[in-house]
Amino acid sequence: MRVNFSCMAGVVRDVRGTRKAARLTCGRGPANSARAMPRVRAGALEVFYDTDGTGEPALLLMGLGGEHHAWDLVRPELARRHRLVLVDNRDAGASDEAPGPYSLDDMAVDALAVMDAVGVERFHVIGASMGGAIAQRVALQAPTRVASLVLLSTWGRTDAFLATILASWRLMAERLSPEALLRAQTPWAFTYRFFQNPAPEVRAWQAALAERGVLKSVPAYQRQVDACLAHDTLDLVPLLRTPSLVLVGEDDILTPPRYARALAAALPAGEVMLVPATGHACFLETPKPCTERILRFLAKHPLA
């Protein structure tokens, strides 16, 4: 299935040119950018997304405080074989700030609204960290639409260990500058290898992130933390029959391999795979082996 997306007059066309209605608007980015920014109305919010590549569609969901640019180092290879739909979650990136508290289920509703608007009925889902938790909710809400799940560096139930870390970040967001918060979180995301020999492309990505702005706002970040604190799907995912790859860095200290094993064990069609010599942000620290594993898995589970 190949899908072409356009952002013109609120119309989405498939490869045959069939006209499809979409709840779609086009805004603009920063003043120095002339590129159209497609946004989808999801309830009271507008949610930003980007598209890239050709092939079977894949929905990409990023983690806590992150936006679609966090996929930049794996995006080119993924886009060679798949049509990517990269979403900025509510309270992050170019999407709107939420008016109040919400759950990861609400964020899954946002993601499904994007796929509705671009006219894609069935797709793969790739989620990292909080995005992996949202991906679980997407599959639970729309099991017949999700062809496969790739869950990176994620978890199925927030335990006391992870809750303590998240609560500390919630407090730090109030007390520190966004840049200081990012520096404090970096050792949780990368291994010692990164600090010994930081890859130039990751440093460039970090510099670009600092220029764009690390956080949407402190309240926005805290609302996402609160949604993560309430996450618990381990008793729900056994209902899924979706082929699922739970991918984790072998040295991930934030969502360690024990989380991946527990989640994969709860998924009837789940398998766990470790990426060697990398940590939580495996898609940044070791993008090539991460991408290779994702693409091999997706190739085994086509939409048909």
Where are these regions (language model features)?
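Flexible "cap/lid" loop of the alpha/beta hydrolase fold
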Residues: 136, 140, 147-176
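Conserved HGGG/HGGXW glycine-rich cap/lid loop of the alpha/beta-hydrolase fold
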Residues: 43-97
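Gly/Ala-rich beta-loop-alpha elbow adjacent to hydrolase catalytic centers
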Residues: 127, 131, 135
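Catalytic active-site module of serine/aspartate enzymes centered on a nucleophile-bearing elbow/loop
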Residues: 270-304
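Short beta-strand/loop motif that positions the catalytic acidic residue
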Residues: 240, 246-248
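Conserved alpha/beta-hydrolase catalytic His-Asp/Glu region
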Residues: 160-162, 180-236
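Active-site loop/oxyanion-hole signature of alpha/beta-hydrolase fold enzymes
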Residues: 86, 90-126
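Acidic catalytic loop of the alpha/beta-hydrolase fold
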Residues: 251-255
